[in-house]
């Protein structure tokens, strides 16, 4: 992989029914039904909606042998109606179910965390090396017969690791780490290679975008060390709904797609499954536009670690850089100074116009020609105004420059002026690559000026802005390069307030600045036995004002307690119409009737002093 120049990773080809993937095949789009798998008609109708929206694979939850056998009828019905889209069985806990599903589905997803190992209990287990080897042998004994069935039936498999369902065995040896997630996957991949079974797709997912990206990068590195090139399925679990789900998914998945990683994706939204497909398509199409872009010559900083990045060292200039939270700058070139109190920018960039009505809690950036020395007013320069910048008396200055503009003269000026905040601009097809090049040039030159990324768009739909800007910012945030974001959408189709909200949403999705309640909510599947979408809406209505609180809303226990380990409170399906409530990892109350559960959740939050009116 070239860190600055886009090219797609060359993966093995995998044959999934009539729709192969990997290699030079297109990046495939998929979704998962949320109907009951024993309801053949409902599954078929929902699968058709997914397919007609553009879905290329349809996954169905497969809890038991009955559900696995019913895949035969679902598959037959779809084929009889002219649909050839492959079906994927989603299996947890039971190898026998996987073996039956392999007879009727074109692909079977298994979870290494619960395929052989017992369900996760968060207990610390101690193994000698000999005992650990015996546990691996148990995997071989159950996994190899499954591979043989898949060989006989030309069935592909996905080895799908979830952060929320790592086994106690893996957790005890590796901890709750990316390394543990990678090893959980590699244990199964090594058996596949040994058995010469190569029709394998892999995924490593988490609701935490940073962990998800770090782990996939680490997995690719480990596969390369072991001469493997299995294709990647990408996704952010429990991304949520609405703009939060879109931004979080685009940031995590986009950060990897922009590096050429990924052969199929699923955008997991807590919405109708077919609603996921257009979002995924927009994301893939946007990233692929950079194929064949003009080459970006750049040198990676020796101290940068792609699989374990740390924040770039900068000096603090006012409230920007150093160890401070990244800032949001809002471009207000039309003299519209209205701001939201919840998503209030740290600075407004007003161009050549000095605003008359100013707030004391916001900084104002103006072009140097408009600067008058007033309090909270800061001058901005371009890279052709270095002499003026050098002699300017302001104690905090902003320099707009591109990578190509970062010449020796500019860098010499920056060495003399640590009080300058750099605002990076790019018109390149691969703006991520050019922004990275600029940041690494600063590192290589020992320059520690804070770095803000100016992301310019011209969108008419808010969803398009959210997807593109999150994808462009994802890797910059995860690589530790971002001290701030200036997000601007040219035209008046999207309000400044919505642009600001998107900028704050990106920083929160990248886990570097919190501005609102965070919801870790799954998309639901056939295991979800309550109305997920309406429940999420009710919980949000009651808790949206609790800034910084994390609430998990999960359909079932497969990933629930694990993915919610980072949440303050959890709402988890426990059976038909029944809910369990959690505080952190601890189950506080079980089997609450669904109609009482939201109220009980609010009572639990209040009882622990985390609720504010």
Predicted regions and their residues:
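Beta-strand/loop-dominated core regions that host nucleotide or nucleotide-derived cofactor-binding catalytic loops
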Residues: 576-579, 587-610
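Catalytic alpha/beta core domains of metabolic enzymes, predominantly
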Residues: 126-143, 148, 170-320, 398, ...
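N-terminal amphipathic alpha-helix/helix-capping segment at the start of soluble metabolic enzymes
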Residues: 1-31, 147-153, 289-335, 541
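C-terminal accessory/binding modules appended to enzymatic or scaffolding proteins
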Residues: 322-343, 531-575
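Glycine-rich phosphate-binding active-site loops on the catalytic face of alpha/beta enzymes
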Residues: 56-59, 105-121, 258-274, 421, ...
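Conserved, mostly hydrophobic/aromatic
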Residues: 29, 90, 159, 202, ...
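Active-site beta->alpha loop and helix N-cap motifs at the rims of alpha/beta catalytic domains
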Residues: 55-187, 318, 327-339, 344-433
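Short, acidic/polar
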Residues: 38-49, 93-98, 249-253, 335-341, ...
């Amino acid at each position: 992989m070239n860190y600055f120049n886009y090219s797609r990773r060359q993966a093995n080809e995998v044959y999934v029914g009539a729709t192969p993937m990997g290699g030079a095949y297109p990046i495939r789009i998929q979704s998962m039904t949320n109907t009951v798998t024993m309801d053949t008609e409902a599954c078929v109708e929902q699968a058709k909606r997914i397919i007609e929206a553009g879905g290329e694979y349809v996954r169905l939850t497969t809890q038991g042998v009955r559900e696995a056998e019913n895949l035969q009828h679902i598959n037959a019905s779809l084929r009889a109606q002219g649909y050839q889209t492959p079906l994927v069985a989603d299996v947890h806990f039971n190898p026998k179910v996987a073996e039956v599903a392999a007879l009727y589905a074109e692909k079977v997803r298994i979870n290494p965390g619960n395929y052989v190992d017992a369900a996760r209990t968060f207990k610390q287990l101690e193994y000698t090396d000999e005992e650990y080897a015996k546990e691996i042998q148990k995997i071989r004994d159950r996994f190899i017969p499954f591979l043989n069935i898949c060989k006989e039936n030309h069935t592909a498999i996905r080895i799908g690791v979830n952060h929320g369902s790592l086994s106690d065995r893996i957790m005890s040896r590796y901890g709750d780490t990316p390394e543990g997630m990678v090893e959980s996957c590699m244990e199964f991949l090594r058996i596949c290679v040994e058995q010469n079974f190569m029709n394998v797709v892999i995924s490593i997912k988490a609701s935490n975008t940073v962990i998800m990206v770090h782990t996939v990068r680490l997995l690719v590195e480990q596969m390369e060390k072991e001469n493997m090139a299995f294709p990647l399925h990408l996704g952010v679990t429990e991304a949520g709904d609405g703009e939060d789900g879109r931004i979080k998914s685009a940031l995590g998945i986009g950060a990897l797609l922009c590096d050429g990683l990924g052969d199929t994706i699923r955008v997991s939204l807590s919405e109708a499954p077919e609603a996921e497909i257009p979002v995924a398509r927009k994301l893939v199409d946007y990233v692929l536009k950079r194929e064949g872009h003009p080459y970006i010559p750049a040198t990676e900083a020796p101290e940068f670690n792609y699989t374990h990045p740390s924040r770039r060292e900068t000096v603090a200039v006012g409230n920007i850089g150093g160890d401070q939270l990244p800032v949001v700058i809002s471009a207000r070139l039309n003299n519209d100074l209205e701001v939201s109190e919840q998503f209030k920018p740290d600075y407004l960039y007003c161009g050549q116009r000095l605003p008359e009505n100013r707030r004391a809690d916001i900084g104002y950036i103006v072009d140097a020609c408009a600067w008058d020395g007033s309090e909270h007013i800061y001058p901005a320069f371009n890279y052709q105004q270095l002499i003026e910048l050098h002699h300017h008396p302001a104690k905090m200055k902003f320099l707009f420059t591109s990578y190509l503009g970062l010449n020796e003269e500019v860098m010499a000026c920056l060495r003399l002026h640590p009080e300058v905040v750099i605002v990076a601009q790019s018109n390149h097809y691969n703006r991520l690559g050019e922004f990275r090049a600029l940041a690494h040039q600063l590192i290589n030159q020992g320059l520690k000026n804070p770095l803000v990324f100016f992301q310019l768009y011209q969108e008419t739909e808010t969803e398009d802005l959210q997807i593109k800007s999150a994808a462009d910012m994802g890797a910059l945030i995860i690589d530790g390069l971002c001290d701030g974001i200036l997000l601007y959408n040219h035209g008046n189709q999207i309000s400044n307030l919505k642009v600001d909200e998107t900028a704050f949403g990106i920083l929160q999705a990248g886990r570097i600045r919190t501005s609102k309640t965070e919801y870790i909510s799954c998309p639901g599947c056939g295991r979800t036995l309550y109305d997920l979408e309406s429940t999420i809406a009710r919980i949000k209505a009651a808790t949206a004002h609790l800034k910084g609180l994390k609430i998990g809303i999960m359909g079932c226990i497969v990933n629930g307690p694990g993915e919610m380990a980072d949440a303050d409170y959890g709402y988890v399906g426990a059976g038909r119409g029944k809910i369990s409530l959690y505080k952190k990892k601890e189950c506080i109350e079980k089997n609450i009737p669904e109609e009482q559960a939201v109220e009980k959740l609010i009572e639990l939050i209040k009882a622990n002093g985390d609720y504010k009116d």
